[in-house]
Each structure stands twice: as structure tokens, then as C-alpha cells.
Amino acid sequence: MIEDVKLDYDLSVFLDADYEQHHGSCISYQTVEQKDIHEKAGGFPKTYTEDNTKIQQLWFEDGEVDYQILGDQLKMEVITVSTILQPPGNTVTLHRDTFYQFKLSYPDDPRTKVRANIYLQDWEPGHVLHYQDENLDWQSDSHWSAGEGYLWD
């Protein structure tokens, strides 16, 4: 399922956050836990390193942001909220979301997990998101406005 969404929320709480408190790379677990994805694409590219796959991810508790307002607008129950700052020149590699934080808190919850990907800033040249649609065809997204995004499972 892929659905276009638009969030009317003060995004400054995310934009003004201190992203210097976390630096990491997404590849450390992907090369081990998600080999099946990369095998379909010819293997994990040797050109990806910890130096060009940096992310700075923050998690927000209910109260720091209003889970109820977010959930009402997105028509979903919000369990976790995180944001990722991706430094220039870095990429998030091909991956499958594992809903790690959700599964830690609710290991026996059988409900379908969905992800809302909301753009926090207007699109600028060089920004792009690649994803597979419901037919597993590759799509590219650009030219978005802050608050727009996608909901997918």
C-alpha cells in the first residue's frame, strides 16, 4: 500500500532538533540482515561505506510531539516518531524497514505496520527518494513541499 499524505503540523520541532547527538550508518545491519534484497540487485555495492551512508536519527516521545494530532491527520495510530538528517553526499542504501522500535515495544502485535515518510523541507536539487510501488516497480520522487509524503507498509 502506498498512499499520498499531507501533514499540517509545525515541523520546526524536528528541524530545530539537535542532530549532533547521533551519528551512525545504516549499512552495519543491512549487509547482514538484508542480504536477500541486495542479492536481487547484484550484491551490496562495494562503493557504499560508513563514510557515505551516514545518518543522524532522532526519536521523539509523545509529548515532545503530539502523537494524537499526527495520528489523526495520517489516519493511523502513531507508536514511534523519528527523523533522519542525511548529510550532503550521503545515501540511505536499498533496504526494507524492519520496524525495530515498534517490535521492541510490541513484539506480539499482529497488526500491519505502516511507515509515514514526511518531507520536513521543500525539495531542492539533489534531493530524491526511490521506492518500489505496490507493483514492485521502481519510482522516483522529487519536487515535494514540506509536510507532503507517503504512507506505506
Language-model-detected regions and their locations in the chain:
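Non-heme Fe(II)/2-oxoglutarate
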Residues: 1-83, 91
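Catalytic core of non-heme Fe(II) oxygenases with the double-stranded beta-helix
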Residues: 71-151
